[in-house]
A protein has these predicted regions:
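Short, cationic-aromatic polyanion-contact patches
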Residues: 18, 74-96
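Short amphipathic alpha-helical interaction segments
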Residues: 50-65
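Exposed, interaction-prone assembly regions rather than primary DNA-binding/catalytic cores
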Residues: 103-127
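Winged-helix/helix-turn-helix nucleic-acid-interaction surface
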Residues: 88-103, 109, 113
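A short, conserved structural fragment
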Residues: 64-74
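Short acidic, hydrophobic short linear motifs in intrinsically disordered regions
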Residues: 34-45
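Short alpha-helical segments that sit at the start of domains
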Residues: 1-32
Length: 127
């Protein structure tokens, strides 16, 4: 649909349905097995045009309100993690997501987490 802000930037095969985006978020959090920041989650879903930024932000908010995900603090950083309801949702509905979307999301997540780990281990101080 022309002018639909929730589909701008979505690549062919990407997700346009908000319920599928919610499933993707729960699936990602379950699959990586650790809480992720908004920035990391957004980078994962935006990398291959899996969904639109505004649809992602809306889905994340809805999941918080519905109790599927929670926020945990790591210093000053807010991280998102699945609740038991989010894990159950991912397990029940992950097959609704196209295999290509699941594979791209996990591939990007693995690369991003490796990059974050490298950066945290290789701190440089300039004197």
């Amino acid at each position: 649909m022309p002018g639909d802000g929730f589909i701008e930037g979505v690549e062919p095969g990407g997700l346009k349905d908000i319920s599928e985006i919610k499933i993707l978020i729960c699936y990602l959090l379950k699959s990586v097995g650790k809480p992720l920041s908004f920035k990391s989650l957004n980078e994962i879903v935006q990398h291959d045009g899996l969904c639109n930024y505004f649809a992602f932000a809306s889905a994340l908010h809805d999941l918080l309100v519905s109790g599927h995900i929670d926020i945990v603090k790591d210093g000053n950083t807010e991280l998102y993690k699945n609740t038991s309801l989010g894990v159950e949702t991912a397990e029940l509905f992950e097959r609704r997501l196209p295999a290509s979307v699941r594979e791209k999301a996990i591939g990007t997540a693995v690369k991003l987490l490796a990059k974050i780990k490298r950066e945290s281990e290789n701190r440089v101080e300039i004197e």
